[in-house]
Design a protein with these regions (language model features):
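Extracytoplasmic/secreted proteins, especially bacterial periplasmic and envelope-associated proteins
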Residues: 15, 19-30, 59, 63, ...
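Conserved catalytic neighborhood of penicillin-recognizing serine enzymes
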Residues: 54-69, 165-220, 264, 279-304
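Non-catalytic, structured segments within soluble enzyme domains
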Residues: 1-91, 124, 183-186, 222-225, ...
C-alpha cells in the first residue's frame, strides 16, 4: 500500500505487477537498512508473493443500473431481478449478438416478466455495454421502435370481445387499395379468403387491414392507449390503417407488459404495469382492459404460430405450449418476438439502435429463435385453464366460420363468447336450382321443362374466389346458367384493380415518358371472354387471364368490362 499512491493508475495489482514487486522489495530493503524491521522479518516479507489480481466488479444488468442511476437520484434501490435468470439471459444475449454481428446486426434487448408476481426477473437493455459505438449504450427496452405486426393480437382480441368477429370467420385476402394505401402480405401472395385465427397465426397483412377498417382506427387507437402503449400518442388520423402494420412506435417495455396483462387476465390477477423495485409499489386502482374469454381465444390462435425449429413441435408432448407473436418493421429495421406462458412473458427485440435496416432482420428468423432459447432456460409450466362460465355453444358454418345460416349444410358446435352471437350469419351459402347432373343452374321459369335438384352451394365473391380456388382445389365455383333460361342477375365479374374511385399516379418510364396502368378483374367462369372499354372506347379482349395495360391521360376515367354473356361491370378512377 505504501508504494501504490505514487502511480496508482500505472502500477497496481492488475497492471505492472513486476514493477510493483520491485518497488515493494526496495521499500522493504530501506526499512531493513534503517532497522525499522529486523532481518528475519525482512526475509519473511520479501518471500511473500503479491496478492492475486482482484476479480472484476460484477457487471450484472448494467442497463438497469444505469436506468436507476438516472431515475432514482441516488435513492437506495432493491430490484426484482432474479440474478440467476439475469446472468443466463445476458450470456444467451451475448452469444446471439455474436451470431447476429456477422450480418451487421448489432443490438438486442430482452425483457422477462414473472406473470404471477408481476415482477421483472430479467432486464437486458442491450448488449456490449462497454462499447461506446454502434448504439450499444442505448437501453432499447425503453426506446420507441416501429411495431411491425406485434399489435395484431390486440386487434383480434378487441374484435372478439366486441362481438364483431368469430375465431374462424373468413376474411378477405385479395389485392386492396384503400385511398392509395395498398398493403401486401410478406409472401407477396393472395389466398382469397383465410380464417381469422389462421390469418393471425400467419401474420397476414391484408386480413389485418380489413379487420382494422371494419373495427375502426380511432377505437383501436384508444384501446392501445388503454393497455399502456404510451408512445402511440399522436391522433388516430396520423396513423390511419398503417397502425396495424407498424405505422406506430412502441417500447419493448410497454408491449411485453401488455402481453403479460393478457396472461394475468387468465390467472384472474389484477392487470397493472409490472414492477422493477422491491417492495412492490403501492397498489393503485385500475380497470382491467383484458377479459379472459377473448384472451383465451386469442392465445388459442397464437399457440399455432409456426416455431423456428424445423422439427414438428406439435407432435412432441414435452414441448411447452407458448402463445407467441413476431413482428418485422418496414425496411427490416426492427425484429420483435413476444411470448406468454402462465409463468412468464418474454419480449425480444433485435436490430440496430441507429435505425439501420438489414435484409435478414425478420422477427421469425432472429427474435423468434432468441425467444425460444430463453423459454428453454426458464422453468416450464402447464397451459392456462380455460375460463369457466364465460363461453356459450353456437352452431358455426364449417366452411365460412360464421354463425350457421339458413343453407349451411356442414356445421360444428363451438364455444364462443356471448357477444359472438351477434355476428352475421353465413352469407356464402346459397340455395341454387341445378340440372340433374349439376352442370348448369336452372331458373324457376325453366324448372318444369327438365329434372332439377336444389342444393346448398358455398360461393365466394368473384375476386375472393379467383385466388381462393388456386389454394383450395376442393372449391367448386357455381356452374353457369342454362342458356335461354332468363336473365342472370348474378354478377360473375369483379374488378381486382382499380377499385372504385381510386386515385392513381402513373409511374414514369426510364426515358421519362408516361408509364402504364395495369387493370385486372376476376371472372367466375374460367372460359369466359371479356371485352374491355375505357371511356366507352374499345381497348382489348382477354381470355383465361383478364389483365390489360392502359395509358390513360390525367383526369377522371370510366372502365367497363363486358363478357360474352352480356354481363357488364364498371368502375371509375382518377389519374393524377
Amino acid at each position: 500500500l505504501a508504494v501504490l499512491p505514487n502511480a496508482p493508475a500505472m502500477i497496481h495489482l492488475s497492471k505492472g505487477r513486476k514493477t510493483l514487486l520491485d518497488k515493494r522489495n526496495r521499500l522493504l530493503k530501506q526499512l531493513l537498512e534503517k532497522k525499522t524491521i529486523d532481518s528475519s522479518t525482512y526475509e519473511l516479507a520479501i518471500s511473500e508473493p503479491l496478492p492475486d489480481e482482484p476479480h472484476a466488479l460484477p457487471q450484472i444488468a448494467p442497463y438497469l443500473v444505469s436506468r436507476f442511476y438516472q431515475e432514482r437520484n441516488g435513492e437506495y434501490s432493491r430490484s426484482t431481478i432474479n440474478k440467476g435468470i439475469q446472468t443466463q439471459v445476458e450470456d444467451l444475449a451475448e452469444r446471439w449478438s455474436n451470431e447476429f454481428g456477422r450480418s451487421d446486426i448489432r443490438n438486442l434487448a430482452i425483457l422477462v416478466i414473472d406473470i404471477p408476481s408481476n415482477q421483472v426477473v430479467a432486464y437486458c437493455g442491450n448488449v456490449h455495454f462497454d462499447r461506446k459505438q454502434g448504439g450499444n449504450q442505448v437501453d432499447v427496452i425503453q426506446a420507441p421502435r416501429s411495431t411491425g405486426s406485434i399489435l395484431k393480437p390486440f386487434l383480434y382480441y378487441a374484435m372478439l370481445q366486441e362481438g364483431s368477429l368469430l375465431p374462424d370467420m373468413l376474411l378477405p385476402d385479395v389485392p386492396v387499395n384503400i385511398n392509395g394505401f395498398t398493403p401486401q402480405n410478406f409472401s407477396m401472395q393472395f389466398e382469397g379468403a383465410v380464417p381469422a385465427s389462421e390469418a393471425l397465426a400467419r401474420s397476414l397483412n391484408i386480413p389485418a387491414v380489413t379487420m382494422l377498417q371494419r373495427y375502426g382506427v380511432p377505437k383501436f387507437h384508444s384501446f392501445l392507449q388503454q393497455i399502456g402503449l404510451k408512445t402511440i400518442n399522436r391522433s388516430s388520423s396520423h396513423y390511419g390503417l398503417s397502425l396495424i402494420l407498424g405505422g406506430a412506435e412502441a417500447t419493448l417495455w410497454d408491449v411485453t407488459n401488455a402481453y403479460a396483462m393478457m396472461g394475468r387476465s387468465l390467472l384472474q390477477l389484477p392487470q397493472r404495469s409490472c414492477s422493477l423495485l422491491l417492495p412492490t409499489s403501492r397498489i393503485t386502482e385500475s380497470t382491467d382492459p383484458f377479459q379472459p374469454g377473448a384472451v383465451w381465444q386469442t392465445f388459442d390462435a397464437l399457440k399455432e404460430v409456426n416455431r423456428p425449429e424445423e422439427i414438428d413441435w406439435k407432435s412432441i408432448p414435452s414441448m411447452q405450449t407458448i402463445a407467441w407473436k413476431t413482428g418485422t418493421s418496414y425496411g427490416f429495421r426492427d425484429a420483435w418476438a413476444v411470448g406468454v406462458t402462465p409463468r412468464y412473458a418474454v419480449g425480444v427485440w433485435v436490430g440496430n439502435a441507429t435505425g439501420e435496416g438489414k435484409p435478414g432482420l425478420v422477427g421469425a428468423q432472429t427474435a423468434g429463435p432468441v425467444l425460444f432459447d430463453i423459454f428453454n432456460l426458464l422453468p416450464s409450466s402447464s397451459w392456462f385453464t380455460r375460463p369457466a362460465g364465460i363461453f356459450v355453444e353456437a352452431e358455426v358454418c364449417r366452411k365460412s366460420g360464421h354463425l350457421k345460416g339458413r343453407f349451411c349444410d356442414e356445421t360444428d358446435t363451438l364455444l364462443v363468447l356471448p357477444a359472438g352471437l351477434r355476428t352475421e350469419a353465413c352469407p356464402y351459402h346459397h340455395l341454387v336450382t341445378l340440372s340433374a347432373n349439376e352442370s348448369q343452374r336452372i331458373y324457376e321459369n325453366c324448372a318444369n321443362t327438365e329434372p332439377t335438384l336444389r342444393k346448398s352451394w358455398f360461393t365466394l365473391p368473384p375476386v375472393w374466389e379467383w385466388y381462393y380456388k388456386q389454394h383450395h382445389p376442393e372449391y367448386k365455383p357455381l356452374p353457369p346458367f342454362k342458356a335461354g333460361c332468363g336473365e342472370d342477375t348474378f354478377q360473375p365479374m369483379q374488378f381486382i384493380y382499380p377499385p372504385m374511385n381510386a386515385r392513381i399516379k402513373l409511374p414514369k418510364q426510364l426515358d421519362g415518358s408516361k408509364g402504364f396502368l395495369t387493370v385486372e378483374l376476376a371472372h367466375n367462369n374460367p372460359n369466359a371472354t371479356v371485352f374491355w372499354h375505357l371511356d366507352e372506347t374499345y381497348q382489348a379482349q382477354t381470355q383465361d387471364f383478364h389483365k390489360i395495360s392502359l395509358q390513360p391521360a390525367a383526369g377522371k376515367h370510366s372502365l367497363t368490362a363486358v363478357d360474352g354473356e352480356g354481363n357488364t361491370i364498371s368502375t371509375t378512377f382518377f389519374v393524377e
